[in-house]
Amino acid sequence: MRKSFLKRGSTLVAVLCGIALNPFAAGTASAQEVKNATLYGNMSTVTQDMLSRAGGDANNFLHTNGNYAQTRYYPASQINTSNVKNLRPAWIFQTEITESQETTPIVVNGVMYITTSFNHVYALNAATGQQIWHYKHKMGPITTYCCGPNNRGVAVAGDKLFFGTLDAKLVALDAKS
């Protein structure tokens, strides 16, 4: 039972991300929150000040677990104790990977970034789940992994995404492409 649950992880993780992090999931996003989800427009550079204040930013989710303190707190006001029971999946995104998922997504300017097992990174429209781009790191001749072929997610700074690979590389990607 547990194994089959993990095999469906790629879909489940994305659905839960869509519910938990999507500022549009409750269907009551404020006009300001919609306006700030720029997606394909001028993506603001993520500064150290933005990273330091991430816990109070209702438009972005810039850290694994939300902030440097790892609180998992999201300050948006449209989801509250009276309407949380009404949340429904906003979208489902199916990755091409069927292994377990152990990633935490981040959201920057309306774009959700997720990683999967075997060094894949996806950029998704956080409002719709539509894929914007996909990157797959080519690995060397590695045959064993500690603890499975998992990836824990990306970090963001400036206009770059950073992630560690199974073959001990640190990769920097342009967040827009």
Where are these regions (language model features)?
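Bacterial N-terminal signal peptides
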Residues: 10-23
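Boundary at the C-terminal end of the N-terminal hydrophobic targeting segment
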Residues: 25, 29-31
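Aromatic (tryptophan-biased) beta-strands that constitute blades/sheets of beta-rich domains
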Residues: 32-95, 130-143
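Extracytoplasmic beta-rich repeat domains
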Residues: 93-106, 134-155
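Short loop/turn segments that connect beta-strands within beta-propeller blades
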Residues: 126-128, 175-177
